[in-house]
Regions:
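SF2 helicase/translocase NTPase motor core
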Residues: 13-111, 159-168, 274, 325-353, ...
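Conserved Helicase C-terminal RecA-like lobe
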Residues: 195-216, 221, 236-369, 442-457
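SF2 helicase motor core recognition
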Residues: 136, 314, 358-375, 385-387, ...
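Conserved P-loop NTPase motor "coupling/switch" region that bridges the ATPase
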Residues: 71-72, 97, 105, 114-196, ...
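Walker A/P-loop NTP-binding motif
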Residues: 5-21, 116-121, 146
Length: 457
């Protein structure tokens, strides 16, 4: 929310003046969820830049079509998936520049998506990200292999020189050395910068500690017993045990949300107030959310609700619509592109009858969107990556926001949610020393004893 998109648009306008005779186009690759947002921002701030979208069934597909397509100073917007499919078409082209939005999407060096982007040629390359390190330091090496190949050495050299000393031993000298190498290539803004903080209103972060219902406790304990039996089983090797850890983690998160999330049952229709109340009372988390939404609606404000589970989002949407008789929007990975634009426009609308609540899946809606009409943000279930959570919050808390923003994070007490929340506070300090990061896969790397302590109810 600190102007990365506008920075790039300004840059594209700037280079058009001293270099009017550039013969080809600039390529911008972004997630599908923000494709229309890029188009809209370019039309708004740079209407004289020729902008086209290369995406969908009607896009060009033959090399013979490239000549008329690659116009001077044209901005071509496309997605990661489209580039992966069309790399043979674009690999021979040398673009003015290749710009990758949410560059952490190419963090996995072995993925087809990353391999395709690496093959693109441009006079310059840029990457945009709020979370360049999401899980492991090696992701930074992959991103720099795209931006400045060779700067950080080979994978093996980088691992020996930086990854092992920093991730295993938190070696301060290695952290400082790495910062010295990469900082000249990073333009970084933070909300604490003096010239930015004056443009932002206050942000209040509140943790809401919730208890499990009796039904949830029973399900939780049964699941924990399963994993304890597995971890104590001498016949199963360590790799299999660790593989099951993240699977159980997802189960426990779902139980903390609502008992129905753990079952194969569909969310009921909730046809009358009695059914709604009975269903809501099965989860103190859902009950508390409903109460807080009442405050939002009373003040005639708007709210964002983030969850990582599609079934949870569907449940929240249905409960709130039936409880309050309002239109609740739901933005997730399965929403078609044309409808995504409608959802954002509807939420951002200032008309009295516009939708006041927007539920978003963390993966599809946690980056790139401008949702400054929201003044309350709920993290219904926690993502064990503080940087990703912060990115989601920044859909509302960004330049353009004029009202104070309240951020509520639900934490179910005496469960894995509370214990990992405490661990994250300790972990965040190291991640912040390099670039904001810290992720979820570290949980499976904990010792067996530490895991047992985490899972115990």
């Amino acid at each position: 929310g600190l102007g990365k998109t506008i920075e790039i648009i300004s840059f594209l306008l700037y280079i058009k003046e001293p270099y009017p005779n550039l013969q080809t186009s600039t390529l911008i690759i972004c997630p599908t969820s923000v494709l229309f947002n890029w188009k809209r921002e370019l039309q708004k701030f740079a209407p004289n830049l020729d902008t086209v979208i290369h995406h969908g069934s009607d896009r060009i597909s033959e090399p013979t079509e490239l000549r008329g397509f690659l116009k001077p100073h044209r901005v071509i917007l496309t997605t990661f998936g489209t580039i992966r499919n069309d790399i043979d078409l674009f690999q021979p082209v040398t673009f003015n520049g290749v710009i990758v939005d949410e560059v952490q999407n190419i963090k996995n060096i072995s993925s087809q998506q990353t391999q395709a982007v690496m093959k693109l040629q441009g006079a310059y390359r840029m990457g945009l990200s709020g979370t360049p390190i999401e899980n492991k330091l090696m992701e930074l090496w992959t991103i720099f292999k795209f931006l400045n190949p060779g700067l950080l050495g080979t994978q093996k050299q980088f691992k020996t020189k930086y990854v092992i000393p920093i991730e295993r031993f938190q070696d301060r000298d290695s952290i400082q050395n790495l910062k010295r190498v990469i900082n000249p290539f990073i333009l970084r803004r933070e909300k604490t910068d003096e010239n930015i903080i004056q443009d932002l209103p206050e942000k209040n972060e509140i943790k809401l500690f919730i208890e499990l219902s009796d039904e949830q406790k029973k399900l939780y304990q049964e699941s924990v017993n399963q994993v304890m039996d597995l971890m104590n089983n001498q016949k199963i090797d360590e790799r299999q045990k660790r593989g099951s850890v993240l699977g159980l983690l997802m189960k426990l998160k779902q139980i903390c949300n609502h008992p129905i999330q753990f079952s194969d049952q569909k969310v009921p229709e909730l046809k009358n107030p009695q059914e709604i109340k009975k269903f809501t009372n099965k989860s103190q988390k859902l009950k508390r959310l409903v109460e807080l939404i009442d405050e939002v609606l009373t003040k005639k404000e708007k709210a964002l609700i983030f969850t990582q589970f599609r079934k949870t989002g569907k449940m929240i949407k249905r409960v709130l619509e039936h409880y309050y008789g309002i239109n609740v929007l739901y933005f997730h990975g399965g929403v078609p592109e044309h409808k995504r634009k409608y959802i954002v426009d509807e939420f951002q609308s200032k008309t009295l009858d516009s939708a006041p609540i927007l539920v978003l899946s963390l993966k599809a809606g946690g980056t790139g969107l401008n949702l400054t009409r929201g003044t309350t943000v709920f993290h219904y279930d926690r993502w064990w990556n503080p940087a990703v959570e912060a990115q989601a919050t920044d859909r509302a808390y960004r330049i353009g926001q004029t009202e104070p923003v309240n951020v509520y994070k639900f934490v179910t007490v005496e469960t894995i949610e509370e214990k990992i929340d405490n661990l994250l506070e300790e972990k965040k300090e190291l991640a912040d020393q390099i670039i904001p990061g810290g992720g979820e896969s570290w949980i499976s790397d904990l010792s067996q004893q530490k895991l047992k302590e985490l899972f115990a109810l």
